[in-house]
Amino acid sequence: MSRVKRGVTARARHKKVLNQAKGYYGARSRVYRVAKQAVIKAGQYAYRDRKVKKRTFRSLWIVRINAAARQHDISYSQLINGLNKVGVELDRKALAELAVYNKDAFAAVVEKAKAALA
Protein backbone atom coordinates (compact mmCIF):
# COMPACT_ATOMS: atom_id res chain seq x y z
CA MET A 1 0.00 0.00 0.00
CA SER A 2 1.20 3.46 -0.80
CA ARG A 3 1.67 6.14 1.81
CA VAL A 4 -1.06 8.77 2.07
CA LYS A 5 -0.03 12.27 2.97
CA ARG A 6 -2.98 14.31 4.18
CA GLY A 7 -1.78 17.85 3.55
CA VAL A 8 -4.16 18.41 0.64
CA THR A 9 -7.28 17.18 2.44
CA ALA A 10 -6.38 19.01 5.65
CA ARG A 11 -5.89 22.24 3.72
CA ALA A 12 -9.24 21.78 1.97
CA ARG A 13 -11.01 21.09 5.27
CA HIS A 14 -9.43 24.13 6.93
CA LYS A 15 -10.28 26.31 3.95
CA LYS A 16 -13.91 25.15 4.05
CA VAL A 17 -14.28 25.99 7.75
CA LEU A 18 -12.52 29.35 7.40
CA ASN A 19 -14.79 30.26 4.47
CA GLN A 20 -17.83 29.43 6.59
CA ALA A 21 -16.40 31.68 9.33
CA LYS A 22 -15.97 34.68 7.02
CA GLY A 23 -17.23 37.85 8.64
CA TYR A 24 -16.72 36.59 12.19
CA TYR A 25 -14.80 38.82 14.61
CA GLY A 26 -11.09 38.41 15.32
CA ALA A 27 -9.63 34.94 15.73
CA ARG A 28 -13.03 33.39 14.99
CA SER A 29 -12.46 34.19 11.31
CA ARG A 30 -8.69 33.55 11.15
CA VAL A 31 -7.65 30.69 13.45
CA TYR A 32 -8.89 27.25 12.38
CA ARG A 33 -9.38 25.82 15.88
CA VAL A 34 -11.41 28.82 17.03
CA ALA A 35 -13.25 29.17 13.72
CA LYS A 36 -14.33 25.52 13.82
CA GLN A 37 -15.93 26.00 17.24
CA ALA A 38 -17.60 29.22 16.10
CA VAL A 39 -19.02 27.56 12.97
CA ILE A 40 -20.37 24.60 14.99
CA LYS A 41 -22.01 26.95 17.51
CA ALA A 42 -23.45 29.07 14.70
CA GLY A 43 -24.99 25.94 13.21
CA GLN A 44 -26.55 25.04 16.56
CA TYR A 45 -28.00 28.54 16.90
CA ALA A 46 -29.32 28.42 13.33
CA TYR A 47 -30.99 25.03 13.90
CA ARG A 48 -32.56 26.16 17.17
CA ASP A 49 -33.73 29.49 15.83
CA ARG A 50 -35.40 27.96 12.78
CA LYS A 51 -37.70 26.28 15.30
CA VAL A 52 -38.05 29.39 17.52
CA LYS A 53 -38.88 31.56 14.48
CA LYS A 54 -42.26 29.85 14.15
CA ARG A 55 -43.12 30.63 17.79
CA THR A 56 -41.87 34.19 17.48
CA PHE A 57 -43.98 34.95 14.42
CA ARG A 58 -47.08 33.39 15.96
CA SER A 59 -46.70 35.60 19.04
CA LEU A 60 -46.16 38.66 16.79
CA TRP A 61 -49.37 37.88 14.90
CA ILE A 62 -51.27 37.49 18.18
CA VAL A 63 -49.98 40.86 19.44
CA ARG A 64 -51.06 42.56 16.20
CA ILE A 65 -54.50 40.92 16.22
CA ASN A 66 -55.02 41.84 19.88
CA ALA A 67 -54.04 45.48 19.27
CA ALA A 68 -56.40 45.76 16.29
CA ALA A 69 -59.22 43.90 18.08
CA ARG A 70 -59.06 46.21 21.10
CA GLN A 71 -59.65 49.18 18.79
CA HIS A 72 -63.00 47.51 18.09
CA ASP A 73 -63.74 47.00 21.82
CA ILE A 74 -63.09 43.26 21.90
CA SER A 75 -60.18 41.27 23.33
CA TYR A 76 -58.11 38.77 21.37
CA SER A 77 -59.49 35.76 23.24
CA GLN A 78 -63.09 36.89 22.73
CA LEU A 79 -62.40 37.48 19.03
CA ILE A 80 -60.94 33.99 18.53
CA ASN A 81 -63.80 32.45 20.53
CA GLY A 82 -66.36 34.31 18.41
CA LEU A 83 -64.68 33.28 15.16
CA ASN A 84 -64.65 29.64 16.26
CA LYS A 85 -68.38 29.81 17.08
CA VAL A 86 -69.18 31.31 13.67
CA GLY A 87 -66.94 28.79 11.92
CA VAL A 88 -64.58 31.31 10.31
CA GLU A 89 -61.34 29.44 9.69
CA LEU A 90 -58.85 32.28 9.25
CA ASP A 91 -55.46 31.51 10.74
CA ARG A 92 -53.58 34.03 12.87
CA LYS A 93 -51.25 34.98 10.03
CA ALA A 94 -54.18 35.93 7.78
CA LEU A 95 -55.94 37.79 10.60
CA ALA A 96 -52.77 39.77 11.34
CA GLU A 97 -52.41 40.67 7.64
CA LEU A 98 -56.02 41.90 7.61
CA ALA A 99 -55.48 43.85 10.83
CA VAL A 100 -52.45 45.67 9.44
CA TYR A 101 -53.20 46.11 5.72
CA ASN A 102 -56.98 45.81 5.30
CA LYS A 103 -58.70 47.40 8.27
CA ASP A 104 -62.18 47.35 6.69
CA ALA A 105 -62.08 43.59 6.14
CA PHE A 106 -60.79 43.08 9.68
CA ALA A 107 -63.66 45.21 11.02
CA ALA A 108 -66.13 42.98 9.16
CA VAL A 109 -64.53 39.87 10.69
CA VAL A 110 -64.74 41.44 14.15
CA GLU A 111 -68.44 42.23 13.64
CA LYS A 112 -69.10 38.57 12.75
CA ALA A 113 -67.31 37.46 15.91
CA LYS A 114 -69.23 39.98 18.05
CA ALA A 115 -72.53 38.78 16.57
CA ALA A 116 -71.69 35.20 17.53
CA LEU A 117 -70.89 36.23 21.10
CA ALA A 118 -74.05 38.30 21.59
Swiss-Prot record:
InterPro entries: Ribosomal_bL20, RIBOSOMAL_L20_CS, Ribosomal_protein_bL20_C. SUPFAM superfamilies: Ribosomal protein L20. Keywords: Ribonucleoprotein, Ribosomal protein, RNA-binding, rRNA-binding. Disulfide bonds: none annotated. Gene3D superfamilies: 6.10.160.10, Ribosomal protein L20 (1.10.1900.20). Pfam families: Ribosomal_L20. One of its GO terms (biological process) is translation. GO terms for cellular component: ribonucleoprotein complex; ribosome. Belongs to the bacterial ribosomal protein bL20 family. PANTHER family: 39S RIBOSOMAL PROTEIN L20. Binds directly to 23S ribosomal RNA and is necessary for the in vitro assembly process of the 50S ribosomal subunit. It is not involved in the protein synthesizing functions of that subunit. This is Large ribosomal subunit protein bL20.
